Amino acid sequence: MRYWLCVMFDDNSQLLDIARAAEEVGFHGIAVADHVAVPHGFRSVHPSGENPFVPETNFPDPLTTIAAMAAVTTQLQFLPYVYVAPMREPFSIAKQAGTVAMLSNYRFALGVGAGWLREEIALLGQDPSTRGARLDEMLEILRGFWDDGTTEFHGRHYDFGPTSMFPKPDQHVPIWVGGKSDAALRRAARHDGWLGMNYDLDEIPILLGKLQDERKRVLDERGDDGRPFETLVIPNAIPDRSLHADLEARGVTSTVAVAWELGAPSAASLDAKRAGMEAFASAFF
């Protein structure tokens, strides 16, 4: 099992030190949250059924944050968890995420999702009702630019002729897809991994079964490219070794660790966060 450290709601002044400490302690990577601007009074419901934050919560830009963290580390991997692509347009995502991948020496996977905060998507000038269909097209566009440098696309939501974007990555940039709907699982199966978040223990095997069926269908259609397929899950349970061993036996490759109480005054200091990381590492690494 690979352990990613959850980094969200933190003070910007601590982020680089958190990255250094996470690498020293032995985390595999860091997962960074994504929101641009949170409208007050939003009515959208988070998939957990709870309101996870207030509009004034700290959300530094994830790609900028990852680039800075990568510059002060050498082994740590990085992941937006998850980057809400449909509240943006695909060209800037391809340029920015591709650049982060290259400058981090490919210690980066683009974790994407359709998003749940419809008011934020609309605020940024995008249609929340088409976010899933647009995400499907966006991921094809990203792959075209990253793999070939010059691409064209003719879809329902994006339509453009031959267009170039250089420099292009000279290694494969993984795309991991979040969500538990049937559409999200199909989307994940077509790419490089699946990101699951806060699912009950009795729900996880069902979702994994659906994912494996979709993945088999994709491989039967286009063959196996030999690249690893990541399955990252956060179970809605207190973590322990036996639980993680069971998840690993079911095909889960990674999980995200919350090493301190997010946003809690008791964890505000960098020393408290480092102590939380060390305690988690002692228990699980």
What are these regions (language model features)?
Residues 1-285:
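Active-site-adjacent structural elements that line small-molecule/cofactor binding pockets in enzymes
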